[in-house]
Amino acid sequence: MSEPKQYVMTYEGVKKLEGELEYLKTVKRKEITEKIKVALGYGDLSENSEYDEAKNDQAFTEGKILQLENKLKNAVVVDESEIPKDIVSVGSKVKVKDYDFDEEVEYSIVGSAEADPMSFKISNESPVGKALVGKKIGDIVDVVVPDGISKFEILDIQRG
């Protein structure tokens, strides 16, 4: 049997998932239970769309709870004191010059379980993340992206 997938995460990422899990287990489950009770009060379940919707919501929520529990159970938390100051790694904040857009961007390198590109938290497994990990200030990397090749220069590295 294969080993379960391990999720490299920052301490902040673990705390965020724990908060989401707590919300789903306490608040969301109660909301769904109430929706099911109300829908059952409407009688005939064969044509009860409120009941169907509540049961679907329940199934989705329970699946999400299992997913979060699995990620937390298999989380490998990055020790901030072990994050190198001069090499990009999980837990680093990296300021880069994006030559395609002629702008500076700051990314946080995180594990795939906590990636959020809209918040500039990119996974170490993403194309840009893979290209940056292991590099130093002054290094220039070419990254294969869906639109072609992007070029980034590492301007600064900090611990997360």
From Swiss-Prot:
<dbReference type="InterPro" id="IPR022691">
    <property type="entry name" value="Tscrpt_elong_fac_GreA/B_N"/>
</dbReference>
<keyword id="KW-0175">Coiled coil</keyword>
<comment type="function">
    <text>Necessary for efficient RNA polymerase transcription elongation past template-encoded arresting sites. The arresting sites in DNA have the property of trapping a certain fraction of elongating RNA polymerases that pass through, resulting in locked ternary complexes. Cleavage of the nascent transcript by cleavage factors such as GreA or GreB allows the resumption of elongation from the new 3'terminus. GreA releases sequences of 2 to 3 nucleotides.</text>
</comment>
<dbReference type="InterPro" id="IPR006359">
    <property type="entry name" value="Tscrpt_elong_fac_GreA"/>
</dbReference>
<dbReference type="InterPro" id="IPR036953">
    <property type="entry name" value="GreA/GreB_C_sf"/>
</dbReference>
<keyword id="KW-0238">DNA-binding</keyword>
<dbReference type="GO" id="GO:0006354">
    <property type="term" value="P:DNA-templated transcription elongation"/>
</dbReference>
<dbReference type="Pfam" id="PF03449">
    <property type="entry name" value="GreA_GreB_N"/>
</dbReference>
<dbReference type="GO" id="GO:0003677">
    <property type="term" value="F:DNA binding"/>
</dbReference>
<comment type="similarity">
    <text>Belongs to the GreA/GreB family.</text>
</comment>
<protein>
    <recommendedName>
        <fullName>Transcription elongation factor GreA</fullName>
    </recommendedName>
</protein>
<dbReference type="InterPro" id="IPR018151">
    <property type="entry name" value="TF_GreA/GreB_CS"/>
</dbReference>
<dbReference type="InterPro" id="IPR036805">
    <property type="entry name" value="Tscrpt_elong_fac_GreA/B_N_sf"/>
</dbReference>
<keyword id="KW-0804">Transcription</keyword>
<dbReference type="Pfam" id="PF01272">
    <property type="entry name" value="GreA_GreB"/>
</dbReference>
<dbReference type="InterPro" id="IPR001437">
    <property type="entry name" value="Tscrpt_elong_fac_GreA/B_C"/>
</dbReference>
<dbReference type="InterPro" id="IPR028624">
    <property type="entry name" value="Tscrpt_elong_fac_GreA/B"/>
</dbReference>
<dbReference type="InterPro" id="IPR023459">
    <property type="entry name" value="Tscrpt_elong_fac_GreA/B_fam"/>
</dbReference>
<dbReference type="GO" id="GO:0070063">
    <property type="term" value="F:RNA polymerase binding"/>
</dbReference>
<feature type="coiled-coil region">
    <location>
        <begin position="49"/>
        <end position="75"/>
    </location>
</feature>
<keyword id="KW-0805">Transcription regulation</keyword>
<dbReference type="GO" id="GO:0032784">
    <property type="term" value="P:regulation of DNA-templated transcription elongation"/>
</dbReference>
